[in-house]
């Protein structure tokens, strides 16, 4: 783990951890997120996106057939279901001393969701994901001054 070495070398516990999938995120987003982080002082700020499809209707495959994961929610109208949010897999701001006590950063008690524009999000697991990322990158570049 490089974090302890970074902290010792720079005498700083404040970390911006950006993942390779954050390639589309412009500097102004980091600046705005950091201001929120400093003002609100959560244990961690996570770049977050709203999940567009109700997770409550999610299914899993068992013996070649779909089965609802949340059986009690399948007949609930989507307008009555709570919205769900996900780590966008882009970046985190945190204080290493505060977060080190957790097995996972997602176990922290004070997680601030920094809502991110979907223009900046991407999943990168397949070649088609990469092609879509390149498309989004070119689109964003063409719109920038």
Regions found by a protein language model. Give the residues of each.
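Short, surface-exposed amphipathic charged segments that create phosphate/polyanion-binding patches used
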Residues: 1, 59-63, 127-131
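Alpha-helical elements of Rossmann-like donor-binding domains used by nucleotide-donor carbohydrate transfer enzymes
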Residues: 1-5, 29-36, 132
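Hydrophobic helical membrane-anchoring modules
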Residues: 114-115, 119-145
């Amino acid at each position: 783990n490089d974090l302890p070495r970074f902290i010792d070398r720079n005498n700083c516990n404040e970390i911006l951890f950006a993942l390779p999938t954050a390639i589309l995120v412009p500097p102004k987003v980091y600046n705005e997120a950091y201001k929120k982080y400093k003002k609100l002082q959560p244990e961690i700020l996570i770049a977050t996106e709203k999940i567009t499809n109700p997770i409550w209707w999610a299914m899993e495959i068992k013996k070649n057939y779909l089965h609802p994961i949340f059986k009690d929610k399948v007949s609930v109208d989507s307008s009555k279901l709570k919205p769900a949010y996900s780590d966008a897999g882009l970046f985190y701001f945190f204080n290493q001393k505060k977060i080190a006590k957790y097995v996972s950063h997602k176990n922290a008690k004070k997680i601030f969701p920094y809502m991110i524009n979907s223009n900046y999000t991407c999943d990168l697991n397949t070649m088609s994901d990469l092609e879509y990322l390149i498309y989004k990158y070119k689109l964003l570049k063409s719109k920038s001054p």
